[in-house]
Amino acid sequence: MKFIRNKQLLSRLLIADGIGRSGKTLLCHILTGFENVEKLEYYYFLEHLSLAHYHKKISDDMAVTLIKTQMDVQVFDQMNGRYINTRPDDYTGLNNYHSPNIYIERQNREEHSEPNYVGNPNATGIIGKIEMEKPIFLTFAHDLISRS
């Protein structure tokens, strides 16, 4: 059996990779200044999947499908205003992003459409926004490329 995810919400993922303390966070904060680049988030599952794939515990098609599926969940949740980090001392926190109001507005959205995605009344609007804006998701990893 081959695992395939034909539909995909997230079309652009940017990963800053390198050894620990090599300046990935600084680079990521610079990259957020570019158009459509979302605030920095750490998606730890990318490292877990990469490690499992490297040690041949999951197949190529399963690894790719899991990454696509999980990143689609992340883009939908972030564009819906979920799981926003408000800790002021955290480098992935909302206050360390140049435009925190974008994320606050997403949380306070009042528009509703017909439920079509797990009963979420904003689903159609969120999916349309993702397809129109094509956000670039930004994350970092620790030596991911060496385990790919």
Kindly label every feature range from the protein language model.
Residues 1-7:
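Pre-Walker A adenine-sensing motif
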Residues 10-13, 135:
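Pre-Walker A (Motif I) flank of P-loop NTPase domains
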Residues 16:
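Hydrophobic anchor at the beta1->P-loop junction of P-loop NTPases
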Residues 19:
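Short, aromatic/basic-rich helix-turn unit that serves as a nucleic-acid recognition element
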Residues 22-37:
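A conserved segment at the C-terminal end of the G1
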Residues 43-141:
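PAPS-dependent sulfation machinery
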Residues 140-148:
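ATP-dependent NMP and nucleoside kinases share a basic, alpha-helical "lid"
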